[in-house]
């Protein structure tokens, strides 16, 4: 029989200590993803009794008590986060994404991104909320508006970071209007930040699987769901060496016996050393792909190249099997040329993979997830693709027709041209509409070479970019040893990836903030763009970037300048004019206000643009130190530096939520899941503390 718990006022244990222990117990449950009933376990209760029997009698340990304490803590700590948002130095930027949970709920994750009063970049989970109804833009917008109002940030929402779905474009059109009726369509488009990670994902998938990558992956998943093993093998085999390797890896991992056989052949002692690739989502459960499979494909290729000898030995060892089902199909065996193609693919994908890893962070120091890295990174990758494009430029249309992998997008005439190997692709919005699809016209406009300017990067970032895995194609390529059809396959893949990258590079021009993030970086400034965009047609891009930042600055930060300067003017007028007539005072103020409007805001920007590059490793700190010189511009700059490059926080939170919703906890409600995940995020990232009391 469980002893009756004493009333709190009868206990010798301080109330503050009891409350702290309750908070710590909830913190343990939340952070460790254990059941709410964990403290009801007989062995755990016996263990606690050994240390403090009085404590065991005093604290409510039941699962229902933990659930009530979770609700109380969530409400209390949410007020702490609200205060942090109110005190932020910047506007509150949002990122959001959707997820299907293991218990089949549609869940929306919403994060707030800002710079706190300590000048630190912060990210806080605001909601992990069930999304009812269709995923239309209007429906998503209603959820976002409700969340913003719940958190009392409706009037301070800045930009929104999300993936590139058209529904998200419509969502923002519906979302901003209720929050700010003065918003125009162009204003909304300027605040629509495309997730860099999603762009990189689309580029890599286009390179690997062609222009219809999503359909290819979906067909593979349907084959697996229906148990159509042979059809799936043929489906992947049609993708050439990558598909063949996929089938080999799947064969090895299809049974423990085959995995052990491979391990013996590889003579590895540690499992991590012989594992070829991470399990993909589709291989673990029947759900739609989360669009990150290209990373596992890259890692599969990278590991296979290192284990090439072992793989070939494994295939050779199976050739003596009488049962054909126990052998790898002859059509899937990789030739020497196939292995060389995989080497080329690995070299081309590596910089994309490293860019993804670099920019999915939380803005450490001067990089790793800041907005300025998006445009810089895309310039870097465009040069990378153009280097390989030029190196494979001798592949003719006739050679391309020999390629056996015809499901990829054909190479166009403009892409095959080699007269301008280093030319930067022109933004589609710069061409007359009648030339949008004329690749030959586009190629003829590229008369000047434009190269990624590494010398103007900050020294601490320059080393990382120079060593990020991008080597000249001529130094690492095995092109000359490949037959024509394999060269054509790689050439087509390069074209597919380059086109997708060029498509989203052009879309960056829809918002002035991508270029503004570089211009407002004291280490870069406008000079970086001028040194990078040097071709004749690119000079207009520099002018656009400069005009865009001026227009955005004038529209959204003039009110703040006027408030500061008019307050100073009014105070001065009162001191010097005394009781003079009001009409005269108003006349003076109107003339002064007009002068401020003619110079005012843009004078700050003009003064900043005239500065030499600044030797600083922390742009946020630099702007904080120069607030008095640039009161309005510093506010703009801090707002820009608070914008993340990716919406990767949402993906991370989905992964954490999946650890909470184990097969034994699928009955957990969406509201409880939200409380658990929000508290976990706030505690882990320093937003709140649990278990504080005077005696601790």
Regions found by a protein language model. Give the residues of each.
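Intrinsically disordered, low-complexity regulatory regions of eukaryotic transcription factors
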Residues: 1-46
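Active-site neighborhood segments
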Residues: 32, 36, 40, 45-246, ...
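Conserved, non-catalytic sequence blocks in retroelement Pol enzymes and Pol-derived host proteins
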Residues: 33-36, 99-102, 131-135, 161-163, ...
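Extended serine/threonine- and charged-residue-rich low-complexity intrinsically disordered regions
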Residues: 99, 237, 251-254, 262, ...
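Metal-ion-coordinating, acidic/His-rich active-site neighborhoods
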Residues: 170-174, 191-337
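Short, hydrophobic/aliphatic alpha-helical segments
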Residues: 183, 279-282, 628-643
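Short amphipathic alpha-helical "interface-anchor" segments enriched in bulky aromatics
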Residues: 295-305, 311, 633-662
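Polyampholytic, low-complexity intrinsically disordered segments
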Residues: 550-567, 571, 609, 661-696
